[in-house]
Design a protein with these regions (language model features):
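Active-site nucleotide-donor binding segment shared across nucleotidyl transfer reactions
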Residues: 27-74
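NAD-dependent ADP-ribosyltransferases
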Residues: 1, 58, 83-87
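Short secondary-structure junctions
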Residues: 36-44, 82-100, 160-162
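Catalytic cores of NTP-dependent nucleotidyl/adenyl transfer enzymes across multiple folds
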Residues: 100-243
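A broadly used, surface-exposed interaction patch
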Residues: 66-97, 104-106
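Well-ordered, non-membrane alpha-helical segments in soluble/globular domains
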Residues: 19-28, 74-87, 142-146
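Short histidine-centered catalytic/ligand-binding loop motif
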Residues: 15-18, 72-75, 130-138
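Helical scaffold of the NTase/Pol beta-like nucleotidyltransferase catalytic core
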Residues: 2-44
Length: 243
């Protein structure tokens, strides 16, 4: 499965963890620069459903590569990322590029924050695959849901792409990018898009999927467990910073 965490902390000595209450202001700064392109950066992960009082190290966003390619008159997403970075630089923002992302430093409340903008095909559709409905206090994050979807897709003879949707395992052709249909394909005929919101909601609709969780939990070297450990460590570090 595609690695969803490309940037890490780009400016460790310059940006700060931030209260999710300011995400709206951060997004306004980003999208004010993008207005002329006709493309809009959309929040994903926890940024799509911010919780005031909860802190984040960065804001992840997705933007449609096709719209940028058309606006900048370049041949591919790589060229679009180059132009996108220059656009933000011209607007006075500090930037960096890594992988598929352009990183932008916003400034709200006198402090700097990191925004990671992933430039991907069909960005508006892809962003829906990264919006989660995690229960309060859940030990699982969005990445765990993505891993679970990938395992469910494999069991059904498909592949899961966090940017395209459900694809044919043999031909890589798109099977569906509609979450309602994907839920029915992976869970059952009575499933809905809402059942794909979290690990817990998948298990509630499909108890047999507990086998996937058990298998992942049993492997100490799995991405599933490594992400849980990393998340716990980050929460401890963030708590210490606030003391």
């Amino acid at each position: 499965m595609t690695n969803l965490n490309e940037g890490g902390n780009i400016w460790p000595d310059e940006t700060e963890d931030f209260d999710q209450a300011i995400i709206g202001d951060m997004m306004k700064q980003v999208n004010s620069v993008l207005v002329k392109t006709g493309a809009k950066a959309l929040p994903i992960g926890s940024g799509a459903t911010p919780t005031p009082g909860k802190r984040s190290g960065d804001l992840d966003m997705i933007i449609d590569a096709g719209k940028l390619i058309n606006f900048f008159k370049v041949k591919d997403a790589k060229g679009a990322r180059v132009e996108l970075e220059q656009l933000f630089q011209q607007a006075g923002f500090d930037t960096k590029k890594t992988g598929t992302s352009v990183h932008v430093k916003t400034k709200v409340g006198g402090e700097a924050q990191q925004v990671d903008i992933m430039v991907v095909d069909n960005g508006e559709t892809a962003s829906k695959f990264h919006v989660h409905d995690l229960p309060k206090g859940s030990p699982y994050k969005g990445i765990h849901k993505q891993i679970m979807l990938a395992d469910l897709a494999k069991e059904k003879g498909f592949k899961w792409s966090p940017y395209k949707g459900l694809v044919n395992r043999d031909t890589n052709e798109l099977v569906s990018n509609d979450l309602e249909n994907i839920a029915k394909q992976l869970i059952g005929p009575n499933a809905t898009a809402g059942d794909l919101g979290s690990v817990e909601s998948i298990l509630a609709k499909m108890p047999s999927a507990k086998e996937i969780v058990d298998r992942q939990e049993a492997d100490p070297n799995s991405a599933w467990n490594k992400k849980k450990i990393q998340t716990q460590e980050n929460e401890i570090v963030n708590a210490l910073r606030r003391i």
